Amino acid sequence: MRFFRIFGSAMCLLAAASAAEIKIKVVDPQSAVVAGAQVVLLEVENSSHPVVELTSAEGLAIFRGIGSGPHQVRVLVPGFAAKTTTLSAAADPVTIQLRLAPASETVVVTATRTPVEASSAGADVATLNQQQLQIMNPVAADDALRFLPGAVVNTAGQRGGLSSLFVRGGNSNYNKVIVDGVSVTEPGGTIDLGTLSLAETSRLEFLRGAQSTLYGSDAMTSVVQVWTRNGSTPVPELRFGADAGNYGMENGYASLAGAHGRFDYNVFGNQFNTSGSGPNEDYSNSLEGADVGFSINDQMSVRLRARHDNSVTETPGAWNFNGQNIFHIGGVTYVLSPDLGARARQNNMLASLDLAVKTGSNWTHHFAGFEYNLKTSNIDSGISPENTPFGPINTPFEALVNINRAGFDYQGDYVERTWAETTIGYEFEDENGSVNDPTFALGGHGLRLNEAAYAQQALTLGRLSVIAGGRFVHNTTFGNTGVPRVALGFQALRGGHILSGTRLNFSYATGIKEPRFEETFVTGQFQLPNLNLKAERNRAFEAGFQQNLLGRFVLVANYYNNLFHDQIEFVTVNPTTFLGQYVNLQKSLAHGAEVELQSRLTQRLSWNTSYTYTSTQILLAPPGSFPPNAQGDPLLRRPRHSATTLLTYLGPRWGGNLGGSFVGPRPDSDFDGFGINHTPGYFLLDIGGWYKVSSRVQVYANAENVLNHFYEEVTGYPALGANFRAGMRFRIGGE
């Protein structure tokens, strides 16, 4: 009996020795801990079965019951380069420091809903990390997006003006915008990017192409996703600052963030005001938010996020067309001036609760509940009426929108092998809202209960990578439909010193967009509702290559082709009473090419530049359509030629950037009979930078449109001339 006790004890000691515990600590280039990093551990002798953990609020990933090694560790953190290292033996915390990298090597999450290197994502993704956003200091999302490849931003006027995004020839409501995991677009894709604050944003990703397989309705040509910064310091860190500039610009902000044990938090607020450059151009925006996370145990964590945003914009309307506000037509002189009685207000509230559960060594589940409420009002008192060849404008109106989106999401990620990963998901959403204009007795209330299920398989088979997925959608308005997507990548040349890798890419996808509430449910004197509208669709494919050069440069070139059909347009059904309704009648084509050069000249200096060519045409228009919306016409506000450049330096004592955006001439219209049919091209140059006075004090400055060019992104709405802001940031605590 004694022999068996000794033998059993020996076996237990042997098992304990062979089942080691490995701790991995992940830090960023400034040595700050990184929470939520995906750490994949492999036994070198059995590399086909990975074990996956996420780092805690303290930046630690702990692997228990692991063999004695050797092991290989791979760390994937969005916004940084993937990091792979080999551990010769189990050790106490092994610190892995991340680094910045060219865009193609940066880890992204939007393309596949899981962390993946951009070069293997099967889609084109541009990113802005926290350091870049801090230098750019954007007032709103449109200020940052206009310097990213393939993005054409059209803002109607100055700060707070209605701002739209056009990607690959698609409409402005063909983009899905997600904040902290919650869609912030109205049903049908409408969003104002000019009022979407990026205060306390840790990362922005801009994904181009049809992405409805993973993201559902509205992701017809792109997805924009932003995340709030998490707290990461054991000692609470208070950040606050303010800046001011010309045109009455004033900006103040503060945040309190930190992490202790299993708990992390960030509570923040921001206030921005400006008087603009002319009459009735004031704008103010206030933002409050919180991001709180708690690790219940090593296998389960929960995160609560909330944001409230309130903005007021004075809207002078279209009055200066390409520098001209006096027109002589038919012997009549028309003098246009700003509308002094119009303003827009927006109030929105976002909340989400995400539960992450890890089961087994390679299954991760996310259960999320969310709610988003949006209230907008566009009011014109009519105190500035003006005549046009088509009649008076600036007549009184009151457009009111109240939208609520609430629902539940599930996402499961299974890493079955080093070369295979599966993602599955289910979504339920309740869309409830009303659209009204009491002035014209126009309005309606709508309710949709939508469901969707999706699956995606990612495979790496030698030099070939395959990402294939599908989504089944049930929508109350347009019924059931399927949405497939497949992306192929082939490593044609692994390369040497000069040509350090050649990759060929191809993808085919479909996109869908549900009708807007005002298209489906609204009724009035001149409009009938249409409860039988179909989804707008996009058949999209793209093909291109990625070429690495000298280990510092990456050349990316793609051809894209989008065929939009079942597009919704308003059609008059009774010419006598002018009664009409929205119907699925339009079809259009957009195709072109994108060329991008990504480079990391040094570890601290990066430079990205891009050129986009876009050709569009209306293939089928509703009966009675006339220019500029007739069959054969190009789509409005889509330039044939556009280009961007962004040079960024990030050093220990100072940082700076230089951003340029060129947008060529594009078709447009005044819609009032003045004969305006285009908007001239323009070049916009912005600069920004900061200097560290001490470890706790920074001074910074930003200048936009430094060349002081007169330009309009939307005809009739002059943009700001040269404008600047300067201020100081302070930090207390945070060790």
Model region roles, listed by residue range:
Residues V27-Q30, Q38, L42, L76-F80, ...:
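Short, acidic, small-residue-rich periplasmic hinge/interaction motif at the N-terminus
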Residues D142-S183, S202:
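Extracytoplasmic beta-strand/coil segments of soluble accessory domains associated
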Residues V182-A210, W227:
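Short acidic/polar hinge/loop motifs at secondary-structure boundaries
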Residues N246-N273, G278-P316, L340-F367, E416-T422:
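Transmembrane beta-barrel wall of Gram-negative outer-membrane proteins
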Residues S255, F294-I296, P634-E735:
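Conserved C-terminal beta-signal and adjacent last beta-strands/turns
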Residues V312-E314, A318-I329, N432-G433, G443-G444, ...:
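Surface-exposed extracellular loop regions of Gram-negative outer-membrane beta-barrel proteins
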Residues H328-K358, V401, R448, R503, ...:
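Outer-membrane beta-barrel signature, preferentially recognizing the C-terminal barrel domain
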Residues T460-V466, Y559-L563, V583-D670, L707:
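Gram-negative outer-membrane beta-barrel transporters
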